[in-house]
Structures are given as structure tokens and as C-alpha cells.
């Protein structure tokens, strides 16, 4: 999962002063789940780093724990609003009748499929035979088997990373901006920012029906576009990530015709 | 923090240029670290208390979960218990805290992770001639943990990147104010920073070697076996390169994360002499080692000969055979020739199989290839007899129906 995250992060890094970007893909037949659906959220992979003066990302255990708790709470609240029944896994062994290995296998399989999605949908290696086909990926039988055993309709995989710029780096940024007055300008040394993705799998067919990536940050160290350490920040990220699920291409076209 | 990591791509680091200038100011050679100076920096039951280390350990928890659940692991319980006992012996004060995993990767390596779990590659078990050699590698890896190398190198990296960032910003602002272009100096400083990071990494490897030698001798193993391991590795790489008409990469570059193997071997010899107490009995516990790896030794040899590196494979088999030939080694020696398939190798392999089956412990496959070679040479009756023997030893072999047809 982490590798997938890094690859996507590199792809979406646009040297803008500060922005929030999302880019979602859906199966052509996808209709966002509404009403009485059962959603299984696989262990959300959450990390919060502190960005050192030199620009290194240092993982912070306390912030990470805080953010994970907040993200899970925000997810539960959001799905409840939509009418779905949600179970959020914190460990691999929480599903009755499903072994830890089976969950681990599915996570790894999703990571591999997700890498393909990243490569062919986000990193520019577009496949000519797949144009206008929407999101055309599947986790296959394993996902269907999980759905059959547990009775869930969808599985959601999620990754979120937030990097908080340290005081030293902000000071360095101030110096860089101050330098502009003497002719040495470094107004955007960057470093912080958020990155997240979510992937929705239909457990009846095994297909990855919806995929979204959010990037929020600025190239000016110290200016934040959200902070998942706070409940509000987490709710904001979850909303950005899952709030506006667009239906698939064919569903949209059918809706337009009507 | 691995036993021998692969170097970074040099080209990627050369982008800034100025390599020659920087090389003049940074030497590659460094003094040997004395085992006597290597005191463990942590005690039993160590838990991180600093923020950065807690963060690192938290990340490692997830890594360990992935490693522990990986299907690349060899899970033979007796063998794993043996390895766990070994790290429990040579692990110093943290002996009881470390975990060990055995990965099915036919390569010579071992890695220690920051939170105290080690991954041993199966290729390592093939190459070790006795328990002392294996314990040496494990002691080296334990040395990384005991000397807190991961967090120390992370802090070193943090400190140097901070200094570089502040320095280059200050330099730029100062240059801007005075109207001097400082870009070249900044690039040189960047290279200097990178070089000093690699130097620090090599120093830690040298520390782990010294610490390892000490742990080994303390536990009654001959410490010289660590130097022997390097001698074998250098020999293997030479043989592999010679076969491909190339030269071995001698290491020792400015960008090496580990000291050059030759230098490590030389230092380890001196260190071994230092930690050896005259009059004390040291035992390499070879029999115990062979006993422990016996269930997987055939698989290890099989993995190796299929790597398509006949130079290295032949050297390895000959090195293992210095402690005595047996049917298994003879069979795989012949396999190296057969798979190499140079002019005359088929005859050489046929002779090899014939020699192998003379040993009581020859694997069933030796009889199979012996039989097929005989038939190829026109000795039908003898060939069939050998194949019949193969079927008797392995009646459920995947190719049994075909062989049965050949025999009937």
C-alpha cells in the first residue's frame, strides 16, 4: 500500500502554490452505493509525518494514532449519514469465519491491482485498448469469496498520509521569501501536504468499481490545506475523498437521456 | 542494515558533478574499529522513548506484520527454532528480544530492522560451512540493533540534511546580497553531504563487524570464521565473474554503503585475533549446523544451480565439499555442468551422476539422470536399471509415468 502511495504522490505533485486536487475513476456501470448497503472498510493505512528542516519525512507515532482514530470516526459518521451499515477493521483477525491470511492476501492483491491502476490511470501509461472503458479492474474470486462469507456488499481500501512542516522548515521558508528582496528567491521550498486514496470494491463481482486520489498541499512550507490530526481535518479529508462519488460513464449517459 | 547491500546507482548521484574535487577532500579508507570498544548501547527489553524512534518503531510494526505473514518465508518449525536459539545466544543483552525470519531467497544476505527483527535469506544457509559462520552473520546483524545503528543513521541523515538546507539557503541569501553566484559551491556541498552519509554507513558496518566478532568469541565460537565467510564470498564472486569473463566489483567506492569485502576480511582477521583468548576452547559446531539445515539443504542447492551462475555454483559446491564430498554435493556438481551445457559438459555431467550414485546418500534424481545419461550413451540395460532404482526411490515423482514407459 505504501509503495502505491508514494508512486501516486510523485505523479500528482504539481508545482502549484497551494491546491486541493482530486481525480476519480469509476466502472462504466457504477452507481454510488445508497440506502441499505453493507460496507466493509479494510484497515485504513494512516501515517502522519513531521517534515524536518532539511525536508526529511519523519513518522510520528502519536500524531499517527490520533489521525487514525479521527479518520475512522469521520468515516463511520459519513457512511451512517448515507444509510449504509459499516464495519471498519482495525485488525486482520476481526472477521468471523475469515482467516487472517485471507485478509492479508486480499490486501496484498489490492495493493498490486492498485499499482496497476496508479500506473495506467494516473502515471500516464494509458492503455489505448482501455480508453472510454472507465475503471476496468477486478480482484476476482477472492473478493467475491470474502463477500459471500461475510455478507458485505462493498469493501473499501484506504490510505492517507499527512506531513506536518516543522518549525525549522517554516523558518527556512521565511528566510527564502525574505531572500527575494536581495535577489535570491526561494518562495516555495515545499515539504508538507496531504495525500490520500480510496478504492471501492464490489464484493458481488470482485470488481474495483471506484477509485479516487486526493492531494492537498502547498509548495510554501507552513501553509496547510488541512490537518488530519484534528477531527475537523479528518472529516474534511474523508469528505474530499468519498463525499462526491460520481456514477460511471454509461450510468451518467443514461441519466442524461432521461 | 544488511549484511551486504547493493550499491546505489552511482549515475543518479553524479548529477551534480564535481566528483573529482570532492573525492580529493574525502578519503575512502578508514581505521578499523576495535571489538573492545564495542559496548552494547541497549539493555534487555529495550523500548524507544524518543519521539523519532517511537515513530520508526511504529512503522516497523506494520513491516514486521507483512514480513511475518509473507509467503516467501520458510516455516519449518525446527529450523526456525534453531535460528531463534542462535540469535538468542549471540544477541548480547537483547538476545531474548530479537525475532528472526527465514526468507526463501537464494542470495547471500541478511537484514536487521530497526525494531529488532532480522530476516535471513535462505542463500545464506547454503553458503555457511558451520554454525560459527552463521552465528557470525547473525551476531553482525545483532550488532546493528545493539549499537542502535538505525536511529543513529537516521539522526545523522536528519542533522546533515538540516545543515545542508540551512547552509544553502544562507549561502544563497548572502550571495544574493553581495551579488556573487554561489550555485557551484552549493552543489559541491550537496555532494559532500551525500558522501559523508555513505561514510557514516560504512562506519556502522565496521562497528557491527567488530561487535559481531566480540559476541561470537564470547559465546565460544571461533571469531575467525567471520573472516572466512568473507573469504568465501570473495572467492565466489571472483569465480562467478571469471566465468562470465568479467572482473569482480571490488567495492571501496565513495558511494559504497558497506566497506569493501577485502578490507572487511582483513579487519575481521585482526579483530578475531584480538577477541580470541589463548587457552580457551572454541567450537564451530559444524555437526549441529548440518543437522539443523539437513531438511532444506537439497532445496538450497537446487535453488542455487538454477540461478544460471555456473561459476559461483561450482565454487560454492567445491567450498562446501572441503568438509567432505557426499552424494548430494556430487549430484549438484553434475547438475551445474549439465545446465551449463558447454562443449563436453554432457559427458562431464554423465560422469558426475555416475560418481554421485556411488554414495549411499545420493538423491533419487541422481539415479534418474544417471539412467538417462546411460541410455543416451547407448547403454540401454544399465540405464533402465538406474531408472528402475529411481522409480523405487521416488514412486510418486511427477515424471514417473514417462520413466515407467521408458523402462518397460
Feature-to-residue mapping (PLM):
Chain A
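C-terminal/domain-edge helix-coil "capping" segments
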Residues: 19-51, 70, 139-153, 159-258
Amino acid at each position: 500500500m505504501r509503495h502505491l502511495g508514494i508512486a501516486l504522490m510523485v505523479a500528482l505533485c504539481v508545482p502549484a502554490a497551494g491546491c486541493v486536487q482530486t481525480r476519480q475513476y469509476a466502472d462504466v456501470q457504477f452507481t454510488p452505493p445508497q440506502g441499505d448497503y453493507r460496507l466493509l472498510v479494510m484497515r485504513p493505512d494512516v501515517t502522519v509525518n513531521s517534515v524536518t528542516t532539511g525536508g526529511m519525512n519523519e513518522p510520528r507515532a502519536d500524531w499517527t494514532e490520533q489521525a487514525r482514530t479521527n479518520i475512522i470516526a469521520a468515516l463511520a459518521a459519513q457512511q451512517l449519514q448515507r444509510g449504509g451499515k459499516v464495519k471498519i477493521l482495525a485488525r486482520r483477525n476481526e472477521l468471523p469465519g475469515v482467516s487472517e491470511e485471507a485478509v492479508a492476501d486480499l490486501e496484498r492483491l489490492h495493493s498490486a491491482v492498485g499499482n496497476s491502476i496508479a500506473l495506467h490511470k494516473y502515471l500516464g501509461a494509458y492503455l489505448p485498448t482501455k480508453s472510454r472503458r472507465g475503471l476496468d479492474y477486478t480482484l476476482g474470486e477472492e473478493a467475491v469469496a470474502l463477500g459471500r462469507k461475510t455478507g458485505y456488499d462493498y469493501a473499501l481500501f484506504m490510505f492517507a498520509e499527512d506531513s506536518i512542516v516543522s518549525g525549522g522548515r517554516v523558518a527556512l521558508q521565511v528566510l527564502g521569501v525574505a531572500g527575494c528582496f536581495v535577489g535570491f528567491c526561494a518562495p516555495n521550498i515545499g515539504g508538507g501536504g496531504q495525500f490520500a486514496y480510496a478504492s471501492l470494491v464490489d464484493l458481488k463481482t470482485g470488481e474495483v468499481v471506484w477509485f479516487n486520489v486526493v492531494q492537498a498541499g502547498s509548495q510554501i512550507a507552513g501553509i496547510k490545506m488541512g490537518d488530519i490530526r484534528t477531527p475537523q481535518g479528518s472529516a474534511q479529508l474523508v469528505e474530499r475523498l468519498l463525499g462526491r462519488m460520481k456514477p460511471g460513464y454509461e450510468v451518467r449517459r443514461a441519466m442524461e437521456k432521461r | 542494515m544488511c549484511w551486504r547491500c547493493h550499491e546505489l546507482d552511482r549515475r543518479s548521484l553524479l548529477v551534480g558533478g564535481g566528483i573529482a574535487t570532492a573525492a580529493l577532500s574525502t578519503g575512502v579508507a578508514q581505521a578499523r574499529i576495535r571489538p573492545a570498544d564495542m559496548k552494547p548501547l541497549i539493555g534487555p527489553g529495550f523500548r524507544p522513548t524518543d519521539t523519532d524512534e517511537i515513530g520508526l518503531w511504529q512503522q516497523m510494526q506494520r513491516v514486521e506484520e507483512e514480513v511475518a505473514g509473507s509467503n516467501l518465508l520458510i516455516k519449518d518449525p525446527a529450523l526456525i527454532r534453531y535460528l531463534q536459539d542462535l540469535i538468542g545466544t549471540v544477541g548480547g543483552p537483547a538476545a531474548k528480544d530479537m525475532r528472526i525470519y527465514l526468507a526463501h531467497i537464494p542470495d547471500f544476505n541478511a537484514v536487521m530492522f530497526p525494531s529488532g527483527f532480522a530476516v535471513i535469506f535462505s542463500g545464506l544457509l547454503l553458503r555457511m560451512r558451520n554454525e560459527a559462520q552463521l552465528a557470525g552473520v547473525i551476531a553482525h546483524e545483532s550488532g546493528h540493533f545493539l549499537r542502535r545503528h538505525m536511529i543513529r543513521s537516521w539522526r545523522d541523515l536528519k542533522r546533515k540534511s538540516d545543515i545542508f538546507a540551512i547552509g544553502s539557503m544562507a549561502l544563497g541569501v548572502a550571495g544574493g546580497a553581495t551579488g556573487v553566484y554561489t550555485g557551484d559551491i552549493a552543489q559541491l556541498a550537496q555532494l559532500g553531504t551525500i558522501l559523508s552519509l555513505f561514510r557514516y554507513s560504512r562506519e556502522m558496518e565496521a562497528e557491527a563487524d567488530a561487535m559481531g566478532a566480540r559476541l561470537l568469541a564470547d559465546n565460544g565460537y571461533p571469531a575467525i570464521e567471520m573472516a572466512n565467510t568473507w573469504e568465501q564470498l570473495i572467492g565466489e564472486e571472483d569465480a562467478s565473474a571469471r566465468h562470465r569473463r568479467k572482473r569482480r566489483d571490488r567495492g571501496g567506492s565513495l558511494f559504497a554503503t558497506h566497506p569493501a569485502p577485502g578490507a572487511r576480511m582483513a579487519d575481521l582477521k585482526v579483530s578475531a585475533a584480538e577477541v580470541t583468548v589463548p587457552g580457551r576452547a572454541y567450537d564451530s559446531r559444524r555437526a549441529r549446523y548440518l543437522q539443523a539445515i539437513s531438511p532444506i539443504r537439497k532445496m538450497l542447492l537446487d535453488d542455487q544451480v538454477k540461478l544460471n551462475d555456473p561459476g559461483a555454483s561450482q565454487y560454492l559446491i567445491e567450498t562446501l565439499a572441503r568438509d567432505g564430498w557426499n552424494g548430494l554435493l556430487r549430484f549438484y556438481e553434475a547438475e551445474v555442468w549439465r545446465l551449463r551445457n558447454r562443449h563436453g559438459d554432457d559427458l562431464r555431467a554423465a560422469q558426475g551422476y555416475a560418481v554421485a550414485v556411488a554414495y549411499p546418500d545420493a538423491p533419487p534424481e541422481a539415479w534418474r539422470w544417471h539412467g538417462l545419461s546411460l541410455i543416451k550413451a547407448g547403454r540401454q540395460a544399465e540405464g533402465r536399471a538406474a531408472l528402475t532404482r529411481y522409480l523405487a526411490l521416488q514412486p510418486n515423482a511427477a515424471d514417473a509415468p514417462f520413466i515407467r514407459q521408458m523402462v518397460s
